[in-house]
């Protein structure tokens, strides 16, 4: 069984809407990465210029996650340091940022205060993977 893990910071006290938005960003980050780098080609069509994008998805990922239930597990980290522990574990497992996991930063235009030049780190989203793999991190939250 494939599933996707997302871990969000609890200490930010995000409103339900803000939390939903940040978790949504984390959930689609792996697909957006593929779409962005998927070989854009601008073509003229009846409705104007269009992008045609080709992406490659792992067969097991497609059949066991996308074509099925798209199982997601959302957990909470106590604070930024607790969230960064997930990054450390991921790196120890040989996983790479922007390939296996994505750090999600809020631009701080509404309710959060900026923590650094990138904004505020709100959550981490992992690409969907086999449950026994992602549980190596998920079970700690």
Predicted regions and their residues:
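Positively charged, small/polar-rich N-terminal and surface patches that mediate targeting and assembly
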Residues: 1-141
């Amino acid at each position: 069984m494939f599933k996707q893990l997302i871990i969000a910071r609890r200490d930010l006290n995000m409103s339900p809407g803000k939390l939903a938005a940040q978790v949504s960003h984390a959930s689609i980050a792996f697909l957006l990465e593929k779409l962005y780098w998927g070989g854009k080609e601008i073509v003229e069509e009846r409705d104007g210029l269009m992008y045609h994008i080709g992406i490659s998805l792992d067969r097991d990922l497609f059949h066991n996650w996308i074509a099925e239930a798209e199982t997601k597990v959302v957990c909470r980290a106590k604070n930024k340091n607790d969230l960064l522990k997930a990054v450390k574990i991921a790196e120890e497992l040989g996983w790479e940022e922007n390939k296996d996991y994505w750090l999600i930063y809020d631009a701080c235009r509404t309710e959060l205060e900026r923590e650094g030049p990138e904004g505020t780190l709100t959550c981490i989203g992992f690409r969907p993977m086999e449950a026994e793999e992602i549980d190596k991190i998920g079970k700690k939250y």
